[in-house]
Amino acid sequence: MDPSELTEPQAMVELERLAQQIRALDRAYYEDDAPTVTDAEYDALRQRNLAIEARFPDLRRADSPSLHVSGAPSAAFGRHRHLVPMLSLDNVFGREDFESFVTRAARFLGLNDDQARALRFVAEPKIDGLSISLTYEHGRFVRGTTRGDGTEGEDVTANLRTLRDVPLRLKGPAPALIEIRGEVFLSKPAFLSINAAQAEAGQKPFANPRNAAAGSLRQLDPNITARRPLSLFAYAQGFSSDRVADTHWDYLERLRQWGFTVNPLSCVVESAEAAEAFMDRIARERSGLEYDIDGVVYKVDDLALQDRLGFVGRAPRWAIAWKFPAEQAITRLTRIDIQVGRTGALTPVAILEPVNVGGVIVTRATLHNEDEIARKDVRVGDLVQIQRAGDVIPQILGVVPPGADAPPRGEAFIFPHTCPICGARAERPPGEVVWRCTGGLTCPAQVVERLIHFVSRDAFDIDGLGERTITEFHADGLLKTPADIFRLPDHEADIATREGWGTVSARNLTASVRARQTIPLARFIYALGIRRIGTSNARLLARHYGSYTHWREQMLRATTIGSDERLALGSITGIGGAIADELAAFFMEAHNLETLDDLTAMLTAIEDEDLPAQGHLSGKTVVFTGTLTTMTRPEAKAIAERLGARVTDSVSKKTDLVVLGADAGSKARKAAELGIDTLDEEGWRELAGIGPVGP
């Protein structure tokens, strides 16, 4: 369903689905080097998420994909924290989208039309490889890391030292400390050579050059990496102890002087027309390039403006990726299956005759929900047009009209009103698009999915308890509730005798389980699988309530509509009324309270959540009022949030600081009445570490 057609309840459900699917795709791409979709699919999924959030801004989730970069560092390598985060880029798919990006940047900076038209951008082909960060101290290469989750990545220094495109010493003067960002990739000829060697050795070939590059760089043996002809294009800086250029274009020239390879196709563009012309040129030349690209990156050239624009969520405001369109194909729909998720959602999945789409064999596609099937009038036996454009499995765009001599179409699909797994009644609440099984924890599918979620990477993260093991243990009666996981050590001897197990593997499982009997509160909350509670929401709750005991006490009181605790819960930034309702509903169910009691009896500690401060304004509530003259209101808000503050629009007893611009008005008077600290704009700049404006 098009975002413009969604009701608010439908949008809420869709945003939850999108957050889960994008998180799964991110793990496959960043952590496993095994993407399950093309970049076009992934981009379309993110674009759908952004479109819904734009229409319903109050529904944006704290764990929204628009706010985060996913992909945790692998335990196989050491971890290292980036001095400046390595975030992702937002995407556009046409000139109109690009012009909107320019308009947003200009508005944020407070530029007039003439100034906006004067903005220069550097255009660089977007290499489809693995992003890395190279750290140099006094010109000497000391560390190389992958992007990871954007905050910390895998230390692959030894492997990067084998690349000829990575200077071990920078040529000429350089800052005492600098991070240089680049993209590691395999040329098409190198990819073919590696796959030929893989086939000759009887090993599985890589699916594409990006997978091969990532797999080559993440070898535990640097000698293997050295035998792979990896290349690198340098394209940006992270942290730098000294400014080495005033524009991004000049910085690229400095990279060349230091000994890096910079993409020779990069250029400066000075208008949307020029940006579109460069995009068209690259699209024409794409097939003849020796490396894979999936679009063009455009960056504001002025580095001072980049600093002012900063970041929003997971992406910089000063750069955008203009992506190539998605790929499509036609195949036949053979049947429609219904899958049951951990919250009981019944999701229809189209089973297709295998078809090649962009080099990937597709056999399944999402149908989303009952309304989507009816809107597209999709029936078994139809020829359908599919697109790999954003879901864990591709989506069906529509039915190919049958020819005059085609046989009659099949019957219209009737969505089941009972669960296909447990037979319980399914219901679809008014205003929602999803049918849900009412079987709850009596439904085997929901139980298994909840157990899988409970031990997932962002929850208890228990090694040795994968999807297959949980399914088998549940079928044999070993696992029925989350607390049963912590009783598994009592069955170690029996587990050791199971097929595929042994004494060592059973002992390792016991050790993994016992190691997780102390768990941070945020992980514990996320593991419970409460609807609409993602990792970020869980961290917000953990930070706000501090301990499990306090959180549970407040949630029980919040079950009363209109109570102070319910209102306080809904007022937490990033939570809101809808999520507060889900939390209250969870704590109103007796079996959920029994589960909590069972778990807390098994766990030794789930308190003392250690959540580090973000800056010297961390935990403070700030209000801006009046007209600011040296920066726009969005810019001031972004600076405050980067320093850890919460920015609100109203003054209350909980406000810590009010920044007064010109014509401050009633908020200034209220701050004075409440005895709240105030600062003028100059004082704010000093507090924020920005310094005075000009001479």
Swiss-Prot record:
Gene Ontology annotations for the cellular component aspect, listed alphabetically: cytosol
Family annotation (InterPro entries): BRCT_dom, BRCT_dom_sf, DisA/LigA_HHH, DNA_ligase, DNA_ligase_AS, DNA_ligase_CS, DNAligase_adenylation, DNAligase_N
UniProt binding sites for Zn(2+): C419, C422, C437, C443
Domain BRCT: 612-695
Protein's GO biological process: DNA repair; DNA replication
SMART domains the UniProt entry points to: BRCT, LIGANc
Xref: Pfam families: BRCT, DNA_ligase_aden, DNA_ligase_OB, DNA_ligase_ZBD, HHH_2
One annotated GO molecular function: DNA ligase (NAD+) activity
EC number: 6.5.1.2
Record: active site: K126 (n6-amp-lysine intermediate)
Binding of NAD(+), residues: D39, A40, E41, Y42, D43, S88, L89, E124, R147, E183, K299, K323
Keyword terms of this UniProt record: DNA damage, DNA repair, DNA replication, Ligase, Magnesium, Manganese, Metal-binding, NAD, Zinc
Enzyme class name: ligase
Gene3D superfamilies membership: 5' to 3' exonuclease, C-terminal subdomain, 6.20.10.30, BRCT domain, DNA ligase/mRNA capping enzyme, Helix hairpin bin, Nucleic acid-binding proteins
Cofactor annotation: Mg(2+); Mn(2+)
Catalytic reaction annotation: NAD(+) + (deoxyribonucleotide)n-3'-hydroxyl + 5'-phospho-(deoxyribonucleotide)m = (deoxyribonucleotide)n+m + AMP + beta-nicotinamide D-nucleotide
Record NCBIfam families: dnlj (TIGR00575), PRK07956.1 (NF005932)
Primary role: DNA ligase that catalyzes the formation of phosphodiester linkages between 5'-phosphoryl and 3'-hydroxyl groups in double-stranded DNA using NAD as a coenzyme and as the energy source for the reaction. It is essential for DNA replication and repair of damaged DNA.
UniProt family annotation: Belongs to the NAD-dependent DNA ligase family. LigA subfamily.
Identification of the protein by name: DNA ligase
Gene that produces this protein: ligA
